[in-house]
Amino acid sequence: ELKNELKQGYKEKLVDIREEIMRKRRAGKLPGDTASVLKAWWQAHSKWPYPTEDDKARLVQETGLQLKQINNWFINQRKRNWHSN
């Protein structure tokens, strides 16, 4: 009885928390096909991996990502994997 009352009282909050956790889990990884498009561009331009605005616009169209996501991916990729020497 008490257990059911508590469940009902907190049900909405528990649902909100569960949804928030699921959103956070999804963050961080791009879908494989999207990542492969970006990686292909990266490999083709490995000596100077700085896409032009036109390149970025094309990648937005090809991947369906937002421009900010494209920019962040390249920033992170350069920090983690590129040595200009």
Curated annotation (Swiss-Prot):
Signal peptide: none annotated. InterPro entries: ELK_dom, HD, Homeodomain-like_sf, KN_HD, TALE_homeobox. Pfam families: ELK, Homeobox_KN. It is found in: Nucleus. CDD domains: homeodomain. Residues 1-21 form the ELK domain. The keyword Signal does not apply. Gene3D superfamilies: Homeodomain-like. This is Homeobox protein knotted-1-like 6. It comes from Zea mays (Maize). The lineage of its organism: Eukaryota, Viridiplantae, Streptophyta, Embryophyta, Tracheophyta.
